[in-house]
């Protein structure tokens, strides 16, 4: 399974990004819980979820900066 592409995130609306950030954080929590109880089978999901969360947070921050920067 390939890592998710940032182009997919850039197509999302601000509300969808915010919801996806919450979902990714929740999934990371659940993965950590599974790892602690030794029930985690797909360890690669950590990498994919962290990668996706980073993409979401990056695009969210880019949009915040674009809105706050006055155009010259």
UniProtKB/Swiss-Prot annotation:
The keyword Transcription regulation appears for this protein: no
Keywords: Ribonucleoprotein, Ribosomal protein
GO-annotated cellular components: cytosolic large ribosomal subunit
Pfam family membership, one: Ribosomal_L29
Top-level taxon in the UniProt lineage: Bacteria
Disulfide bridge partners, by residue number: none
GO molecular function list: structural constituent of ribosome
Any one of the GO BP annotations: translation
InterPro entries xref list: Ribosomal_protein_uL29, Ribosomal_uL29, Ribosomal_uL29_sf
Annotated family: Belongs to the universal ribosomal protein uL29 family.
PANTHER family: 60S RIBOSOMAL PROTEIN L35/50S RIBOSOMAL PROTEIN L29, LARGE RIBOSOMAL SUBUNIT PROTEIN UL29C
Annotated protein name in UniProt: Large ribosomal subunit protein uL29
Lineage of the organism: Bacteria, Bacillati, Cyanobacteriota, Cyanophyceae, Oscillatoriophycideae
């Amino acid at each position: 399974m390939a890592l998710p592409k940032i182009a997919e995130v850039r197509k999302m609306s601000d509300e969808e990004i915010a919801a996806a950030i919450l979902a990714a954080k929740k999934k990371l929590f659940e993965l950590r819980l599974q790892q602690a109880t030794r029930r985690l089978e797909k360890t690669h999901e950590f990498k994919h979820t962290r990668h996706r969360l980073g993409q979401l947070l990056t695009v969210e921050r880019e949009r915040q900066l674009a809105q706050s920067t006055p155009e010259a």
